[in-house]
Amino acid sequence: MNLAVIRLFKHHVNNIPNILPHQLATLDYLVRSIIDENKSVLLFHIMGSGKTIIALLFALVASRFKKVYILVPNINILKIFNYSMDVVINLFNADYILENIFIYSTTSFYSINYNDNVINYNGLSRYNNAIFIIDEAHNIFGNNTGELMTVIKNRNKIPFLLLSGSPITNTPITLSNIISLMSDEEINFSDIIIQGKKVFQILLNEHGVNVLKNILKGRISYYEMPDTDLPGIQYHGKSFLDTRVVYCNMSKLQEKDYINVRKMCNNEMFEKNMNNVSLAVLGQLNLINNLDILFQEQDKELYPNLKINNGVLYGEELVTLNISSKFKYFINKIENLKGKHFIYFSNSTYGGLIIKYIMLSNGYSEYNGSQGTYPKLIHGKPKTFAIVTSKMKASLEDLLVTYNSLANDDGSQIMFLFSSNIMSESYTLKEVRNIWFMTIPDTFSQYNQILGRSIRKFSYKDITQPVNVYLLATVYSDFNDTIESLDDYSLEEINTLPFDIKKLLYLKFKTKETNRIYSILESISDSYTQPPHPHIVEIVLGEIVRQFFYHHSRIKQNDERLLTAVKSVLTNTEAAKKYIKEIVDGHFFVSNKVFDKSLLYAYKDEIITVPFKLSHEPFVWGVNFRKEYNVVSSP
């Protein structure tokens, strides 16, 4: 990161269309490392810091010299990247070749490079002299996409820009995949780790620390946004190590079936069934590993007050909630909470069924769907919920537009957004006041990503109000242990703890090693002080001009303040004056604090900001869908 670029911007205004100083400073680093030196880079910027914008800025710069291929996890994130590209282009003050930039989802990229599940090696030559940008890079390995990237890297000898806010998904071993794409070094991971009996006991040894530093030095950009301009976080529940957890003590009904299912699980840390019964129990259905049975049973009695019929749950138990200590707590608590809720859960088939019918039975209506029993209201309208899973048919983007809209700041359009893992990456939520974990996440990175969807800069108008976080754990009816240290229990004792508590302890064990490695990556992150790279000078100058004219509506053409600002990059006075003339003659777009969206104009001996507004007459499109032609008419 070029610290000299950051120092160009004091009191940077962030509430207008802009490029943040750290994004420009990182762009400088990427240009020097990837374009000039042909090195691969890991962009390890913590969630909410604008990695997508940095990646697209770099893609536009690089497009002048090479083809750029951008891979994203799925079609929904592809849409986000395409939208963000339009935003970035509007702020980009330099030449680019858009035809040299290709954005693919991993599945579509797979389809064009494989024939009958075999890599089409003859087609890989198209990636010669290219640059690859991979979003959420930690997720592409262990599948065909990871294999393909390794082949392309070895055959084509091209650089990669890997984006990740959490490069270690589970254990240090996952870092080996990222290293393999970033260097030509062959690493025997058995030489650099200490392997215990459990997954969380995989540690990086001292030799591993040195290997990590030697291979990745000069290839890491680490950045974490300052926590200013963020609301405080209020964790609820019982003290648990360095956080708080809400203990949800089971009823006798839930506890009985919970124990029966637990006896069936040989390795319960990877058993969906334990996640299921920790969320809610459904009688005999919990003893069957095939969830399709849920939607085939007809008028089957699960408990005296709960039945299922063709995938529909009904009965008084959905209100008394002896089947779920977590939902009993949740339903009782939300009655008195204000604002929007974001609720994470796993196992979308089972969880989605439970959530839908508990919410409907307790008076909450489905967004664009069924109305709740005796509907609860806000401003005279039903309080609604939406469930997001990978199987949802409606557009996720449309749903999020409504959820994030100004009209929904109070939750009057959609109050409760339930989501499985699909929402853990790349999406931004706004004005969320209550975050719930109905399932304990599998990894530390997943936990942080879920929090990071909501608690981020520019997502809250009022940062004086805290965000409530509820991490729910299903526990036995008599369990009330206070856990202060990871050493409070032996491994044998941990195995007897409630599933959620055991999972939390494993998560904390893994977190300890993850944090140690992250601190190593942070320590070798590259920073320097140099004038802006020639390839990004115009982009930096554009941001300097935007910042200047936010504060000034009208100045003399020879204004020394503007000249000084431009000369901070263009040290030659004549070059600076020429640049100022060019942006005025070209009617550079700025956002002024008085006039808002404006264009620069020369008026006599002054430079003025002239507000503008795009408008059009009402019109109607008439389209003939015959194959031969379309007719467009306007009255």
Curated annotation (Swiss-Prot):
<feature type="domain" description="Helicase C-terminal">
    <location>
        <begin position="326"/>
        <end position="505"/>
    </location>
</feature>
<dbReference type="GO" id="GO:0005524">
    <property type="term" value="F:ATP binding"/>
</dbReference>
<keyword id="KW-0010">Activator</keyword>
<keyword id="KW-0804">Transcription</keyword>
<comment type="function">
    <text>Acts with RNA polymerase to initiate transcription from early gene promoters. Is recruited by the RPO-associated protein of 94 kDa (RAP94) to form the early transcription complex, which also contains the core RNA polymerase. ETF heterodimer binds to early gene promoters.</text>
</comment>
<feature type="short sequence motif" description="DEXH box">
    <location>
        <begin position="135"/>
        <end position="138"/>
    </location>
</feature>
<keyword id="KW-0547">Nucleotide-binding</keyword>
<dbReference type="InterPro" id="IPR027417">
    <property type="entry name" value="P-loop_NTPase"/>
</dbReference>
<protein>
    <recommendedName>
        <fullName>Early transcription factor 70 kDa subunit</fullName>
        <ecNumber>3.6.4.-</ecNumber>
    </recommendedName>
</protein>
<comment type="subunit">
    <text>Heterodimer of a 70 kDa and a 82 kDa subunit. Part of the early transcription complex composed of ETF, RAP94, and the DNA-directed RNA polymerase.</text>
</comment>
<keyword id="KW-0238">DNA-binding</keyword>
<dbReference type="GO" id="GO:0003677">
    <property type="term" value="F:DNA binding"/>
</dbReference>
<dbReference type="Pfam" id="PF04851">
    <property type="entry name" value="ResIII"/>
</dbReference>
<keyword id="KW-0347">Helicase</keyword>
<keyword id="KW-0805">Transcription regulation</keyword>
<dbReference type="GO" id="GO:0044423">
    <property type="term" value="C:virion component"/>
</dbReference>
<comment type="similarity">
    <text>Belongs to the helicase family. VETF subfamily.</text>
</comment>
<keyword id="KW-0946">Virion</keyword>
<dbReference type="InterPro" id="IPR006935">
    <property type="entry name" value="Helicase/UvrB_N"/>
</dbReference>
<dbReference type="Pfam" id="PF00271">
    <property type="entry name" value="Helicase_C"/>
</dbReference>
<feature type="domain" description="Helicase ATP-binding">
    <location>
        <begin position="32"/>
        <end position="185"/>
    </location>
</feature>
<keyword id="KW-0067">ATP-binding</keyword>
<dbReference type="GO" id="GO:0016787">
    <property type="term" value="F:hydrolase activity"/>
</dbReference>
<dbReference type="InterPro" id="IPR014001">
    <property type="entry name" value="Helicase_ATP-bd"/>
</dbReference>
<keyword id="KW-0378">Hydrolase</keyword>
<dbReference type="GO" id="GO:0004386">
    <property type="term" value="F:helicase activity"/>
</dbReference>
<dbReference type="InterPro" id="IPR001650">
    <property type="entry name" value="Helicase_C-like"/>
</dbReference>
<dbReference type="InterPro" id="IPR002464">
    <property type="entry name" value="DNA/RNA_helicase_DEAH_CS"/>
</dbReference>
<feature type="binding site">
    <location>
        <begin position="45"/>
        <end position="52"/>
    </location>
    <ligand>
        <name>ATP</name>
    </ligand>
</feature>
